[in-house]
A protein has these predicted regions:
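Short, Lys/Arg-rich, polar N-terminal cytosolic tail immediately upstream
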Residues: 1-9
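The first (N-terminal) embedded transmembrane alpha-helix
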Residues: 9-31
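Loop-to-helix transition at the N-terminal end of transmembrane alpha-helices
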Residues: 36-53
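Juxtamembrane helix-capping/reentrant segments at transmembrane boundaries
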Residues: 67-87
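Alpha-helical transmembrane segments and their membrane-interface junctions
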Residues: 89-109, 174-183
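Hydrophobic alpha-helical transmembrane segments and immediately flanking/interface helices
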Residues: 103-126, 183
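Transmembrane alpha-helix/helix-exit interface in multi-pass inner-membrane proteins
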Residues: 123-148
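Membrane-proximal soluble regions of multi-pass membrane proteins
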Residues: 141, 147-183
Length: 183
């Protein structure tokens, strides 16, 4: 069994626990070096990075023939997705507010850390929302159907060609919708 298979095997809830653990560890470790607000932002960034890495490993390594079953495993509930969206929006707003509040007297390394944390938080939050929605779209597309009905799906999206969609198709759709809705 490949290492990627082991990493991609946990369902969405186990991934969430791993990401929460990473966020808590980073928060307490960074408190020794950073102010509370910066430690909170670094903690959120660690959480988001773990979720993004694990989700994108799934997106990039899941063969199309197993996506139907994997989509059932990787789906988060609608309530949890709503909570994700609200928390990521708050994290991004907090990061922007944090950037705006920087004192002009702050220079050098402190300003660079401040700026990097802020920019990374916005990028990670934005990417996290669309990645989670891409996984949700795959679940909604295939519905709760079983392997016996390989060519049947709940639908809702139409993909060009005869090839059944894979995770990357749903991620592409999610990011395109996300970018066009933000304009």
């Amino acid at each position: 069994m490949r290492i990627v298979d082991l990493v991609c095997r946990p369902d969405a809830r186990h991934r969430l626990v791993l990401a929460l653990a990473a966020g808590v560890v980073v928060f307490f470790l960074s408190l020794a070096y950073l102010q509370f607000a910066r430690a909170a932002i670094a903690s959120w960034d660690a959480f988001a990075v773990v979720i993004l890495v694990l989700d994108w490993l799934t997106i990039l390594t899941t063969p199309q023939r197993t996506i139907r079953a994997r989509a059932q495993q990787q789906d988060l509930s609608r309530l949890l997705i709503f909570i994700f969206v609200v928390v990521t929006a708050c994290a991004a707003l907090f990061a922007v507010g944090f950037l705006v509040s920087v004192k002009k007297s702050q220079t050098g390394g402190h300003f660079i850390i401040h700026l990097l944390l802020t920019l990374l938080t916005v990028i990670f939050s934005w990417s996290l929302v669309h990645t989670v929605y891409g996984l949700r779209y795959a679940h909604a597309f295939y519905g709760d159907s079983d392997e016996a009905s390989v060519h049947q799906h709940a639908g809702g999206l139409i993909f060009p060609g005869n090839r059944p969609p894979d995770y990357f198709d749903f991620a592409y759709f999610s990011f395109v919708v996300g970018m066009t809705c933000q304009v």
